Design a protein with these regions (language model features):
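Acidic, Ser/Thr/Pro/Gly-enriched alpha-helical scaffold modules and adjacent low-complexity linkers
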Residues: 2-418, 422-456, 460-463
Length: 466
């Protein structure tokens, strides 16, 4: 394996070479018929920070180009990988070295800045705080093209209930894009559990893990997975556009919110822009936008969150039941903890989610939140103008993304698999070993496959040069 180190800066370049059945390169040994596939794996460290492995695998090649980075710049790194592959094909070693040397010396630039690495190589630094748009965002575009609206809604509901989810596909690029694209629709929340965009063959036992997960499986491995003891697993087959689930999660969500989301998705199915992401953002705001009404503010005391006030804010029984379950979910708990940290530090926050709350009918009379704003403006804490008038440093935004995106480290999976084996052999775990459960659903029902919807206008745009 050849490494091109870029310490503390943008990325680490590697060439992964396939050597028989070596576990370190198993992910690159899957059979593919497509020429020049781009895909992504994720490494989660002991601090639960994610490092992305952006890869380019050519058909029949014995090596895979890989860029490792904490920066979620999918389009940028895929573009650079394609340029490097082109240099390799044309044997342009000087240009190859020039690009990597420039990248090596490059400090992390601010969002929106144009970066020139060589005469023909440049990119614009993405702003991860903006909503992803079609066709610019490759992950969302591939996900929206491959999966119909009905199955997108079912998968969204399954993620809200923190289920065990497997996504299956024969094409690595589409597989990992669907994993990243679907998870992005949870914004401003992030998937907090096991997150593996493409699972190597020697780690298939992870599919039997007793905790929530979001895992991508190459189709060639699915026969082995089917022979495993899969309990309460949601399976989306991207190739056939079919979804299997033992739960009734979508029907248990408030119907008015889901109906509005479905209608918005159908309206934007033949258009470009951030319409898809904004449709999900509006749904998230409808579900969770009243959290500001549940903030408890007392003089000289830290701001806290009252779950009872949050749930009782709604008259609808369906919404109350959903929110009662939601308050026990890790993705919601981490979201609230993050907001409280910012409020209590006096830093505040301003993002597209808060903007959506302010514009929508779900804002209500969040007097406590505005009381905090008034107090801050009078001088008891830092003022919000640093958030409203200045872009946050790129590294702060990115590292927060990496940390929030997966709080549960992969390290815990093996321990919990061992606990599951002990329990199955007749030894009940102690109370301290009890695992977090996924949210309950009132009914259990298998879902019928739905036909794929036609999105030719989107596919026409997808695939254009960056």
């Amino acid at each position: 394996m050849l490494k091109w180190p870029i310490p503390g800066q943008v990325a680490l370049f590697q060439i992964l070479r396939c050597r028989g059945n070596s576990r370190r390169t198993t992910v690159t040994s899957l059979t593919v018929s497509q020429v020049g596939q781009n895909f992504t794996f994720v490494l989660t460290d002991i601090d639960s920070k994610q490092r992305f492995g952006f890869c380019r695998l050519s058909s029949g090649a014995k090596s895979c180009f890989c860029i490792l980075s904490y920066l979620p710049w999918f389009e940028v790194f895929y573009k650079l990988l394609n340029i490097l592959a082109d240099y390799t094909t044309k044997r342009q070693e000087n240009q190859w070295n020039e690009l990597l040397e420039t990248l090596h010396k490059l400090p992390i630039p601010d969002p929106g800045v144009s970066v020139h690495l060589s005469v023909h190589s440049y990119f614009t630094v993405p702003d991860t705080r903006e909503l992803p748009s079609i066709p610019e965002n490759r992950n969302l575009t591939e996900y929206f093209v491959a999966v119909d609206v009905n199955n997108m809604l079912h998968l969204y509901a399954s993620m809200l209930y923190e289920r065990r989810i497997l996504i299956i596909c024969s094409k690595l690029s589409t597989l990992t894009a669907c994993i990243h694209g679907s998870a992005a629709m949870l914004y401003p929340m992030y998937w907090q559990h096991v997150y593996i965009p493409v699972l190597p063959p020697h780690l298939l036992d992870y599919c039997c893990a007793p905790m929530p997960y979001l895992i991508g499986i190459h189709l060639s491995l699915m026969e082995k997975v089917r022979n495993m003891a899969l309990d309460d697993v949601v399976i989306l087959n991207v190739d056939t556009n079919t979804l299997e689930t033992p739960f009734d999660d979508l029907q248990s969500l408030p119907n008015d919110v889901i109906s509005s989301l479905k209608n918005r998705l159908k309206k934007v199915s033949t258009t470009t822009g951030d319409g898809v992401a904004r449709a999900f953002l509006k749904a998230q705001a409808a579900f969770f936008g009243s959290y500001r009404n549940a903030l408890k503010i007392e003089p000289e005391e830290p701001i806290t969150f009252c779950e009872e006030a949050f749930v009782s804010h709604y008259r609808s029984g369906a919404m109350r039941q959903f929110l009662q379950n939601a308050t026990q979910l890790q993705l919601f708990k981490q979201f609230i903890d993050g907001r409280l940290d910012l409020l209590n530090s006096g830093e505040g926050f301003s993002d597209v989610f808060e903007e959506e709350i302010n514009m929508g009918e779900y804002a209500g009379s969040d007097k406590l939140y505005h009381q905090w704003l008034s107090t801050v403006r009078k001088g008891s804490g830092a003022i919000l103008n640093t958030v409203k008038t200045k872009a946050n440093p790129a590294m702060k935004t990115v590292y927060k993304f990496a940390k929030d995106h997966a709080k549960m480290g992969i390290k815990e999976v093996k321990n919990r698999l061992k606990q599951k084996d002990i329990a199955e052999n007749g030894c009940a775990p102690t109370p301290e070993e009890q695992l977090p459960k996924t949210a309950p659903s009132p009914l259990v029902e298998a879902k019928d496959p739905k036909l794929r919807e036609d999105r030719r206008p989107i596919t026409v745009h997808f695939g254009q040069a960056l």
